[in-house]
Swiss-Prot record:
Gene Ontology BP terms: nitrogen fixation; regulation of nitrogen utilization
PANTHER family linked to this entry: BIFUNCTIONAL URIDYLYLTRANSFERASE/URIDYLYL-REMOVING ENZYME (PTHR47320), BIFUNCTIONAL URIDYLYLTRANSFERASE_URIDYLYL-REMOVING ENZYME (PTHR47320:SF1)
NCBIfam families the record matches: PRK00275.1, UTase_glnD
Occurrences of domain HD (ranges): 461-583
Name this polypeptide is given: Bifunctional uridylyltransferase/uridylyl-removing enzyme
GO molecular function, one term: phosphoric diester hydrolase activity
Transport found in the keyword field: no
Residue span of region Uridylyl-removing: 343-705
Coiled coil (UniProt feature): none
Known EC number: 2.7.7.59, 3.1.4.-
Alphabetical keyword list: Hydrolase, Magnesium, Multifunctional enzyme, Nitrogen fixation, Nucleotidyltransferase, Repeat, Transferase
Length: 900
């Protein structure tokens, strides 16, 4: 810390201003304000961050000493002002808490009550954010013995004012001889760290990470230092080098990482104007600019900054693991080593952890680097890797070069890992953590820490990729059949499971390069397969999976699965059941690994329907596609059998069906047709709208909640319905809109609750929805008002210009209107109102919400039930939708198109 820094704090000028004023508050506030400005300017100018946070602590020292001196403490009184915690370390960020301990020799607070209260009041009045405790030395011992946080804070302390002997006495009564011996302290800190990591989903890669608390954050570095200080009296990272706990290279890496995170935290405090350790979307772009990042052709500044952040915290997490393992060996197991169990001439197991039998193993036999992870997978009872071996792995990464990558022993070992029954994900993740995976597969190294600046992908590309592997493994485990019934069944019958893991590893490998990542990734996948000597059929399958990994999800979510042509086209692309099985399993894993909230019951049912229909088409033969008439006959025959079995007169059913039209039977299953038919026949002719809600009691995880509405057609039907559903807090995931020849509407909506769950068998909720929709259709004017809801904070930071594309359907007499826009509350209700304004009827709709964006497709006709033919009308419609969905502060809309 500086001894004198007149620019930051001019003591003589400050004293002069104190003397001039009746109240000291203004002088203190002025000094604090000026110091903040000076330090912020130094930060912007690129001043060394370590010096900055030490300078801030030094400045606060001066203010506190001055404030302390204004009160009447008897000279030599048994009271001291002590800095603890981060401030005790001499580190202060702009709005960090200033943690103080007012330390007494005896429990005689009454003697000092008045000056203590006056001192603390002054600190609050001048605007210092202070956390304070008033304790005697004995009380410190009692509190520290009971509370891990207290003992940790007291370990990092400095005397600001008063006798130093009190702090020394406090340190004596809280030493390892008195409480928290090193083993107990280590275990408590390790459990504390694990609980903290769990709070942040055990990943360094959260979209809005906490710079301090997330895995790989500043708290992990502090945890290392706390344990070292408690056990060995080590005061800082350099001392850990001197004592042999870390190497010079690791010290340099940790120091650079710590200083980077300090810069991030300092900048966050500046931008937020308060204590803020969360790297929120609100600040990421501004912080990237503040730290000097600029856009390039390949990446935005924010993406470059966040990739740097993720790589830094990953390196901290890696070293935290290494040092933590070393501490465990030294603190927990010293003198308790069990027998050594040899695995082969290169590796052995000691105390449940893998280690090399000789420090020169990797140098002599480089293939042992990959063998490490294969052995861990083959012996799942091994708990991990000993710290010395982790360090040796890190130190010998340089051996992984092109020669290493082409060596048959290494390529064989890497493929062997994918054939293991256990531990594939765990050990690929270890390889990534230790920096091995990105060295062996340079194309993987490029995606490490690469963010995707949206809410759809909540992980970096490498984390998502490894999550895909995790979900692929999860599908093989007992207990997942309820949530993934089809995928868990299919994964068991894949002829070569290792191929789907390789496809999962490569499916997003080309993200961030520009161009179609599926096509570019397929090229990389083919090179991988050839280098690893995979057979030709295996290679073709892996390459096909990478190139087509998005096709099944986009088909299921954006196309009409009731259209036989859609199924036939998809079946043609898939070709056979083996490819279909592999693609379905990969798609399920990919969706779950992208964002756990994406896997809802509706997406599950769409994929299952596409799989089932495609499998049926493949069994029938691609040269014999199912025609419309045949599909309609099959559906009617099955539905009629069901109805007759339950007592419905077949003549009544066929009389109703004659009014419904072919599309109705193409878009609904036989079960749904029977359900609708029975209810319509029983419904009184003048009974008003019929609203049916299908309970989803049997499959908690499958199928969205289906709402069927049968009522006399009216022009505002769609607009009223979607507005009412919005007011009922329902998310619409699919809409099938039909009108019978008798001018009755038969509309089916697939909905989920706002949190993505099906409505299930909640009778009260079902009745609330049913009665709400009936009321809306009876009194439409009361429901067309759109509720104005606040746009969620996260969505505001992912605004992009809406895109509206209008073109006529080549297969059917209708116009296809596609909208890609930022998600916002009530969006579908707003679109429905515009359709009403333009006198449009909605024939069908596919609704998809992907993170912060919606990708909706509407099939519409004009008032005469014809496709739109007036280009000027289409242009006005397009402009109206864009204007309605345009958010304030957006750029100009992206180019949209009209093809009539």
């Amino acid at each position: 810390m500086p001894q004198v820094d007149p620019e930051l704090f001019d003591r003589s000028q400050f004293q002069a201003e104190l003397a001039l004023k009746a109240s000291p508050i203004a002088a203190y506030k002025k000094a604090i304000r000026q110091a903040r400005q000076v330090l912020d300017e130094r930060f912007r100018a690129g001043r060394d961050i370590r010096r900055l946070i030490e300078d801030r602590a030094w400045f606060v020292d001066q203010i506190l000493r001055s404030a302390w001196s204004r009160f009447d403490w008897d000279k030599g009184a048994d009271i001291a002002l002590v800095a603890v915690g981060g401030y005790g370390r001499g580190e202060l960020h702009p709005y960090s808490d200033i943690d103080l301990l007012i330390l007494l020799d005896e429990n005689d607070q009454e003697i000092f009550r008045e000056p203590i209260e006056g001192f603390l009041t002054l600190l609050w009045d001048i605007g210092l954010e202070v956390g304070q405790a008033v304790r005697s030395v004995a009380e410190c011992a009692d509190e520290a013995r009971a509370d891990l946080t207290v003992i940790t804070n007291l370990m990092e302390s400095r005397t600001i004012a008063g006798p130093e002997r009190l702090r020394q006495a406090m340190l004596q009564v809280t030493s390892t001889q008195q409480m928290w011996p090193s083993k107990e302290f280590f275990l408590a800190k390790r459990n504390e760290q694990r609980a903290r990591h769990a709070k942040y989903n055990n990943t360094e890669y959260n979209l809005e990470p906490n710079v301090k608390g997330s895995p790989g954050g500043l708290r992990d570095i502090q945890t290392i230092l706390w344990i070292a200080r408690r056990e060995f009296g080590t005061l800082n990272l350099q001392a850990m080098v001197d004592q042999g706990f870390i190497t010079e290279g690791e010290h340099s890496l940790l120091t650079a990482a710590q200083e980077f995170l300090w810069k991030v935290r300092y900048g966050l405090h500046m931008l937020a104007g308060r204590a803020e350790d969360r790297l929120l979307f609100d600040h990421q772009r501004s912080l990237a600019a503040l730290l000097g990042y600029e856009d390039s052709d390949a990446k935005l500044a924010i993406e470059r900054f966040m990739q740097k952040y993720y790589r830094v915290v990953m390196s901290i997490a890696e070293l935290s693991d290494l040092v933590g393992q070393h501490f465990a060996e030294v603190i927990l197991w010293e003198g308790e080593s069990g027998p050594i169990v040899p695995l082969n001439s290169r590796f052995q197991v000691r105390d449940g952890y893998l280690e090399v039998s000789n420090p020169a193993i990797f140098k002599r036999t480089p293939f042992a680097i990959l063998e490490t992870f294969v052995l861990l997978a083959q012996h799942p009872d091994i708990q991990g890797v000993r710290s010395d071996t982790i360090r040796l792995l890190r130190d010998h990464r340089y051996l992984i070069d092109d020669t290493f990558r082409q060596d048959l022993r290494n390529t064989s070992l890497f493929i062997e890992l994918f054939k293991c029954k256990e531990g594939i994900h765990r050990n690929l993740r270890r390889m990534n953590r230790y920096g091995i995976l990105g060295r062996y597969l340079p194309e993987f190294g490029h995606i490490v820490g690469q963010m995707q600046h949206d809410l759809f992908h909540i992980y970096t590309v490498d984390a998502h990729t490894l999550n895909v592997i995790k979900y692929l493994r999860k599908l093989t485990k007992p207990g997942v059949a309820e949530k993934y019934p089809l995928a868990s069944k299919l994964v068991e019958k894949l002829p070569k499971p290792e191929l789907i893991y390789i496809a999962g590893l490569y499916h997003d490998i080309a993200k961030g390069r520009g161009g179609d990542h599926s096509e570019l990734g397929a090229v990389d996948a083919e090179q991988f397969c050839r280098r690893h000597k995979l057979p030709a059929w295996d290679t073709r399958l892996v390459v096909w999976l990478v190139e087509n990994h998005l096709v099944m999800s986009t088909t299921a979510q954006r196309k009409d699965l009731s259209d036989p042509q859609v199924i036939n086209d998809f079946a043609q692309r898939v070709g056979d059941e083996t490819h279909l099985d592999y693609l379905y399993v990969l798609t399920v894993a990919d969706i779950n690994a992208t964002n756990p909230t994406l896997w809802n019951s509706w997406r599950a049912s769409l994929l299952r329907q596409l799989y089932t229909e495609t499998k049926r088409a493949l069994k029938r033969g691609l040269e014999n596609p199912l025609g419309r008439e045949e599909q309609i006959r099959q559906t009617q025959r099955a539905a009629l059998d069901d109805l007759v079995r339950h007592g419905t007169d077949p003549d009544d059913a066929e009389q109703l069906w004659a009014q419904l039209g072919d599309d109705y039977f193409l878009r609904h299953t036989a079960t749904d047709v029977a359900w609708h038919t029975d209810a319509i026949i029983e419904h009184p002719a003048n009974g008003g709208p019929l609203v049916l809600i299908k309970e989803t009691t049997q499959r908690e995880f499958e199928g969205g909640t289906q709402i069927f509405i049968y009522a006399p057609d009216q022009h505002d039907f769609f607009a009223v319905t979607v507005a009412a559903m919005d007011q009922l807090n329902l998310n619409i995931h699919d809409a099938r809109i039909l009108t019978s020849s008798s001018q009755f509407t038969l509309d089916t909506y697939i909905v989920l609750e706002a949190d993505g769950s099906p409505i299930g068998n909640n009778p009260e909720r079902i009745e609330e929805i049913r009665s709400g929709l009936i009321a809306a259709l009876r009194n439409p004017d009361d429901y067309l008002t759109i509720i104005q809801r606040r746009v969620p904070r996260q969505l505001k930071h992912f605004a992009f210009p809406p895109q509206v594309t209008i073109h006529n359907d080549t297969q059917r007499p209708q116009t296809i209107l596609e909208i890609i826009a930022p998600d916002r509350p009530g969006l579908l209700a707003r679109v429905g109102q515009l359709f009403l304004d333009f006198d449009l009827s909605v024939q069908n709709a596919k609704i998809a919400t992907l993170g912060e964006r919606v990708e909706d497709v509407f099939f519409v006709t004009d008032a005469d039930n014809q496709p739109l033919s007036d280009p000027q009308l289409c242009l006005r419609l397009q402009q109206a939708i864009i204007k309605e969905l345009q958010q304030e502060n957006e750029q100009q809309p992206s180019p949209s198109s009209i093809v009539i």
